[in-house]
Amino acid sequence: MITMLQDLHVNKISMSRSKSETSLPSSRSGSQEKIMNVKGKVILLMLIVSTVVVVFWEYVNRIPEVGENRWQKDWWFPSWFKNGTHSYQEDNVEGRREKGRNGDRIEEPQLWDWFNPKNRPDVLTVTPWKAPIVWEGTYDTALLEKYYATQKLTVGLTVFAVGKYIEHYLEDFLESADMYFMVGHRVIFYVMIDDTSRMPVVHLNPLHSLQVFEIRSEKRWQDISMMRMKTIGEHILAHIQHEVDFLFCMDVDQVFQDNFGVETLGQLVAQLQAWWYKASPEKFTYERRELSAAYIPFGEGDFYYHAAIFGGTPTHILNLTRECFKGILQDKKHDIEAQWHDESHLNKYFLFNKPTKILSPEYCWDYQIGLPSDIKSVKVAWQTKEYNLVRNNV
């Protein structure tokens, strides 16, 4: 009896082992199938990605203006590969069409249609974030004018004249602007003046109009310079945003000498400072004191921008003026004043809000520098700086 029980126990163990051994290959087979499925999906995904890359590369190479250099091909990549930074023309929906006055459909020109950096190999024409730097010879005026003629756009221009700046500069500024600024398009000149009785009589082009506003006089010219950010913002909110498509803000102590046209239009436009456009960022006169809201540390910064000219859409200029004035107020609380006042805050703003278009020094040139070979056509020139005559405190 004992022997029979022992035999039965041995048979149970043998059967258990047999079942275990037969189930083990089945488990391994299932795992292998899962691994093969995962590998198959990975291979399929790689094939899809490779196909997309090849098609995209063919698209880039199909653009006729793009050269063989890698940086040029990078520059022409569609805007969604540009970290959200575009020019005005790129920011609109591609292929958008506008109806012309004669009933034809006119396609909005893309950046590569009107801008050719290869025409000026002697200068920097594209920023690291792929925004155009507009130099004489890089833009197609006829193509741009053909498009903007259908848009019936209006461009605004703000200028401040207080104290002795009125007699010394305002009339020359307005008369030259009437001659060269946005020729053939509607323009509104917004003149901010501290004494309207001293406003010069200026006869304007039929497409141009003038709005004069009296502002409070400040004791210090530094305060006048900084308060203009607040004033511009207030006027944009009150009426300018409803009156113009683009807005430029300029200093009064300069004079137009050549066409300042639609090639300058953009969402956020900055002006290179004539004295610093060839310098390295380490030499820029940024605000270097950490306590100031305009502080830019060494090792940071792209260009040095001139506050004498900046522009863009009303919304973008409103944001710019608000942020700059916020920084000015913050500095006042800390009893500090940025080295170059509103210009220091402007440079800080452009550090974190990259301009979509930059104007070369030809658009704001100082003849005291001379006339180097890369300056082909001076659009706006500095007037003689007679600070001892026009400023209350120097």
UniProtKB/Swiss-Prot annotation:
Its cofactor is Mn(2+). Keywords: Glycoprotein, Glycosyltransferase, Golgi apparatus, Manganese, Membrane, Metal-binding, Signal-anchor, Transferase, Transmembrane, Transmembrane helix. Residues 61-394 are lumenal. The keyword Membrane applies. It is found in: Golgi apparatus, Golgi stack membrane. Substrate binds at residues 160-165, 251-253, 273-276, 285, 385-391. It catalyses: a beta-D-galactosyl-(1->4)-N-acetyl-beta-D-glucosaminyl derivative + UDP-alpha-D-galactose = an alpha-D-galactosyl-(1->3)-beta-D-galactosyl-(1->4)-N-acetyl-beta-D-glucosaminyl derivative + UDP + H(+). GO terms for cellular component: Golgi cisterna; Golgi cisterna membrane. The keyword Transferase applies. Gene3D superfamilies: Spore Coat Polysaccharide Biosynthesis Protein SpsA, Chain A. GO terms for molecular function: metal ion binding; N-acetyllactosaminide 3-alpha-galactosyltransferase activity. Mn(2+) binds at residues 251, 253. The active site is at 343 (nucleophile). The chain crosses the membrane at residues 42-60. Belongs to the glycosyltransferase 6 family. This is N-acetyllactosaminide alpha-1,3-galactosyltransferase.
